[in-house]
Design a protein with these regions (language model features):
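N-terminal interaction/assembly modules
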Residues: 1-151, 155-169
Length: 169
């Protein structure tokens, strides 16, 4: 288990959301690209903050940083710690997901869904952030990065994880 005590940010802050988004991109890269977490983290961090995409294609946290330039260090800290912790605890996290997604094998899930669930499960089990806020932000990630059914799928599985692990909503 990791010794990280969670983010020292307010719930639903741009920094926390950006940290999750960078973590998601890095986990996705590790999952589908078969690259080491530190390499994925560095690439995703650089791409997130140095994007040349048009503003309409940026996520809300990314647009915030492009407009203000504030909170970058806090976001990087969250992403780095979260990626390291999830990489270390991935087997335990996947076991929790597997138990709560009775009709879906993790290997059958889309990589984006699988990795949003890993982030959400990690945060729910650690209890750093209120469960409702974790689920809300994971659903927002699913809306931006997933297909049409992805937000409902993420919401349902994370809600089941809360029920199965006696996590108050």
């Amino acid at each position: 288990m990791t010794d990280w005590n969670g983010p020292t940010l307010t719930t639903r802050s741009h920094e926390l959301r950006a940290g999750r988004e960078i973590t998601l991109k890095a986990l996705y890269s590790v999952d589908v690209g078969d690259i080491a977490p530190p390499v994925a983290w560095q690439r995703c961090q650089d791409a997130f903050f140095l994007s040349v995409s048009p503003p309409s294609s940026l996520s809300q946290p990314q647009a915030h940083f492009m407009a203000t330039g504030q909170g970058i260090d806090a976001s990087i800290d969250v992403a780095r710690h979260m990626l390291q912790a999830i990489a270390i605890e991935r087997m335990d996290i996947d076991t929790i997901i597997r138990k709560s997604s009775k009709r879906w094998r993790i290997s059958r899930m889309q990589p984006i869904e699988r990795n949003i669930l890993r982030i959400g499960t990690f945060e729910l089990i650690k209890g750093f952030i209120p469960a409702r806020d974790v689920i809300y932000d994971c659903v927002e990630l699913a809306k931006f990065y997933g297909d049409e059914p992805t937000p409902g799928f993420i919401n349902g599985i994370l809600d089941q994880i809360c029920q199965d692990n006696q996590i108050a909503l």
